[in-house]
Swiss-Prot record:
Signal peptide: none annotated. This is Cecropin-C. Belongs to the cecropin family. GO terms for cellular component: extracellular region. Keywords: Antibiotic, Antimicrobial, Fungicide, Hydroxylation, Immunity, Innate immunity, Secreted. It comes from Heliothis virescens. Cecropins have lytic and antibacterial activity against several Gram-positive and Gram-negative bacteria. Also has activity against fungi. The modification 5-hydroxylysine is found at K21. Monomer. Its main location: secreted. PROSITE patterns: CECROPIN. Induction: By bacterial infection.
Length: 33
């Protein structure tokens, strides 16, 4: 039961890290238009 929770937690952290890394690129693309 705990392994599933840990897996979801890790996945959520990966998604959050991806959003944080992508945010500046999205801003640059938005300014370029």
């Amino acid at each position: 039961r705990w392994k599933v929770f840990k897996k979801i937690e890790k996945m959520g952290r990966n998604i959050r890290d991806g959003v944080i890394k992508a945010a500046p690129a999205i801003e640059v693309l938005g300014q370029a238009k």
